Structure formats: C-alpha cells, structure tokens
C-alpha cells in the first residue's frame, strides 16, 4: 500500500487510503525537515507503516542556507533527497505532496500531489512537522520586495538579486541609482541576519573585488536593521557587543531600535528615514506554516500549535506537533525554534509512538536539552554560548565549522562542503556565483 501512495494516478485522486483490519498502524509525518526526519528515524524499529509527506523532494540543512544565498555553496551541497535519506528504513514510504486539509474526526488528511489531484490519507498517528515561513508581522505586502530565507528557492532568489544588483550598477550612469543598486538592507539582526550580512560583506570586499571595471563592489553599503536594542538578542549582551564590533569592522552598518515602516521597489522607510536600496532581505522573524491551524486547535500569535508537555495536541489523541510548527514551553519559557530543538522533539515523538504501539505508557514529558547557541560572523570569527561558557574568535569558528560539517545529512554533503570551504578560505573565491536565466537582472 505504501508504494501505491508514492505513485498516485489521476484516476485514483478521489480514493481514501485507509488502514485495513489486521494491518500495521499508520503513522503519517508531515514535513521532511529536521523534526520530521528525526521522528521517522526514531520509528525505524516500530511495527508501523510510516508515511513521510513533503511538498519538496529534498531535506535542507537550513543553518547553511545563507551560504547558498551568498554563493559560498551550491544548493546540492546542503540538501539531500528525502527518499535517499529513508532508503534503508523499510517501514518508511515517501510521498511528494502538499497537505491541504486535516480532518481529525475522520482521522484523514488531504494531500495534493503534482499531476495526481487531491486524495485523502487515513492515519492512526499524525505528526505535524511542517516548519516555518517568514513572518512579516501583518505586512505580507513586504514579501514582494523583501524575500525571506527559508528554502533553496529563497536562497537562489537572494543570490540572483545580490549578483544582479552589481550587473545593473555597471549599466547605469546615474550616480544615485548606482548607489541604490549597491546598497543592501537586511531587516532582522538575529543569527540569520548577522550571518547573511557578514558573509555578504566578505563577498563584496574579497570575492568581487577585481571582477568589475566600472564599479568597486567594496564600496557597497550593507545595513543591518533591527527593531530591538541589540543584535543576537538571544545571546548574552557581551557577545552581542562583540558581534556588533566585528560587523562594524567588516563594513556593516548596524542600526538597532529602528522599526521598518515601508518596503517598496525603491528601498525601505525605517525610523522615519528613507533608505534607497535595490536589495532588501527579510530575516526578521518566522511564523508557522498553515498546517497547524488546520488542526483546529489553539495557536500562538505566530500560528504555532499549542501542545501539552508530551507534544500532543489537546483533545486530539495521537496527534503531535513538533519543531517550528509547535509552541513548546519549558520552565515558563518557550523552547527556541532552532535545529537542535526540532531534532530532539521529533526524536521524542517518534520514540513515544513506538512505545505506545507496544502498549507501553510514556510518563516522562519532553525536556529540551540546550547544547548551546552558535553564530558565525564571516571568516575566522564565531560566537558560542552554552550555559556559563561564552566564547568568541578563531577557535570558536573552528568548532562551529566542525559541528556544522558533522551535522550535514550525508557523507557526500560533508565532503563537498568541506572542499568548498577550503577553496573559499584560501582563495577568497566563491564558485556558485550563477544567475539563472529565470532571475536575470531587472526581471
């Protein structure tokens, strides 16, 4: 039955895929990100049929998306086909589809597959691990001019905008327009914004330095805006100050306590001041995907489902929400929306379901173990905070690089990323500086 799910034909589009008496229980996992993959792997020995659904055929190592956006890495180097990741786990099937509805009463979901219409899929257990999307805080119209960075398409769009801006700067004789093309504004000074700004600064000062005759990319203006009072607000203030100083040395203008009021094709208005810019990038926050709201349960302001200490949806037996789709509290504080938390939640739920399938009752609620926070600020400099330990500098950067290489999904990803990093480190060059025809400058 699982194989049939992955090969739906148009004439089967209205069928209800139900579990028949005597068959194994079906666990449906929506989302092939960190939490979804972890949940599936935790069920590898379970006597269950596991169906992993994602609208994309690949898993993304999101912590390095900013390096695709700044041409350090190519998309394939931080991504892996979900089917390949699950190939050795015989109780897992993969379905390329987008979930468009959830019916808890009938315990079915609606899944729309490319070229195969919509079909209903029955479940015994449901794990929602659908991740997040950019949060424009009530101003979704900003998205047209300020793309976020949450998937490979976003990363390639941003890369094309950055590289295309320099091509357009070459073509104009207007001094003001050239300055606008060479001004980059990043909204949001969390880890994503800091890492993207630092990598972009290094790109314009080193990689592109001798590539143009009529312009000097090193004269570009890079502005990092945030409505809060400091960068990296989840880190200790001392580390935030160090990062701000390092960003300034790289040539990044850090403006905190500034709220963005308008984003349009000419730039942004922030703190009452117009900043002309052809490239505005949004790294200010995240919101949950639409799927948690389909459950009909309570959600927080970001659309994340409120769950109990066992990551279950209240009054919905066998339904769990994990990762960025869940609002998880611990000791009165929200569990951070980071990869390590998503992995721990997915693993916990997978193991919980496996025990329940054996007739065992799980008494221990989910507990998040904080392994520490890290952020890299370009070449040779990173910051680390773990409990009382707070470090920064070159050795911390080496630790960051080592941890991220080991965390990549496949051996080939680790080898390719390591190779690209070594090449970039010693030459200053970035080999993924491609502008696809679909993203040509001015289009």
Question: Model-found features: residue ranges?
Answer:
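FAD-binding core/adjacent interface of flavoenzyme oxidoreductases
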Residues: 2-25, 92-187, 270, 281
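C-terminal, flexible cofactor-proximal segment of oxidoreductases
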Residues: 2-15, 345, 350-443
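Short, well-ordered coil/turn residues at beta-beta hairpins
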Residues: 112, 129-130, 258, 283-284, ...
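FAD-site-proximal beta/loop scaffold in flavoenzymes
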Residues: 5-13, 144-174, 266-269, 273-344, ...
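A Rossmann-like FAD-binding core segment of flavoenzymes
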Residues: 6-8, 89-109, 201-309, 313-315, ...
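Beta1-alpha1 glycine-rich phosphate/pyrophosphate-binding loop at the start
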Residues: 2-96, 100-101, 184, 191-235, ...
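Rossmann-like dinucleotide-binding core of oxidoreductases
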Residues: 178-235, 242, 253-255, 337-365, ...
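Short glycine-rich anion-binding loops that position phosphate/pyrophosphate groups of nucleotides
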Residues: 131-134, 197, 286-288
């Amino acid at each position: 039955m699982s194989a049939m799910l992955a090969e739906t034909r148009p004439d089967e589009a209205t069928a209800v895929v139900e579990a028949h008496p005597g068959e194994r229980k079906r666990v449906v996992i929506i989302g092939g990100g960190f939490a979804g993959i972890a949940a599936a792997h935790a069920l590898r020995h379970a006597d269950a049929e596991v169906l992993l659904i994602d609208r994309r055929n690949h898993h993304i190592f999101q912590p390095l998306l900013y390096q695709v956006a700044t041409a350090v890495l190519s998309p394939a180097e931080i991504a892996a086909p979900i089917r390949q990741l699950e190939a050795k786990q015989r109780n897992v099937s993969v379905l390329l589809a987008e979930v468009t509805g959830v019916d808890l009463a009938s315990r079915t979901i609606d899944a729309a597959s490319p070229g195969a219409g919509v079909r209903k899929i029955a479940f015994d257990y449901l794990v929602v691990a659908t991740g997040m999307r950019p949060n424009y805080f009530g101003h979704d119209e900003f998205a047209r001019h300020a793309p976020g960075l949450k998937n490979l398409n976003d990363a390639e769009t941003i890369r094309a905008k950055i590289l295309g801006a320099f091509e357009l700067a070459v073509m104009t004789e207007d001094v003001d327009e050239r300055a606008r093309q060479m001004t980059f504004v990043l909204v949001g000074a969390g880890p994503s914004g800091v890492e993207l700004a630092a990598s972009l600064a290094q790109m314009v000062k080193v990689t592109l330095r001798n590539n143009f005759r009529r312009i000097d990319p090193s004269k570009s203006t890079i502005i990092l805006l945030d409505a809060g009072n400091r960068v990296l607000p989840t880190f200790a203030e001392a580390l935030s100050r160090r990062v701000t100083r390092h960003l300034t040395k790289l040539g990044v203008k850090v403006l905190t306590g500034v709220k963005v009021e308008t984003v349009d094709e000419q730039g942004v208005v922030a703190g009452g001041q117009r900043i002309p810019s052809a490239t505005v990038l949004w790294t200010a926050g995240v919101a949950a995907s639409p799927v948690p709201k389909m459950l009909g349960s309570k959600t927080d302001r970001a659309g994340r489902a409120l769950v109990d200490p066992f990551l279950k949806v209240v009054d919905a037996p066998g339904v769990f929400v994990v990762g960025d789709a869940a609002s998880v509290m611990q000791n009165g504080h929200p569990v951070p929306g980071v990869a390590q938390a998503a992995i721990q939640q997915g693993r916990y739920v997978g193991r919980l379901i496996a025990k329940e399938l054996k007739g065992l009752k799980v008494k221990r609620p989910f507990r998040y173990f904080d392994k520490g926070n890290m952020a890299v600020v370009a070449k040779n400099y990173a910051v680390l905070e773990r409990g009382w330990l707070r470090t920064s500098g070159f050795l911390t950067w080496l630790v960051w690089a080592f941890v991220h290489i080991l965390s990549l999904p496949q051996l080939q990803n680790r080898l390719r990323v390591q190779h690209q990093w070594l090449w970039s480190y010693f030459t200053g060059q970035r080999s993924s500086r491609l502008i696809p025809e679909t993203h040509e400058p001015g289009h």
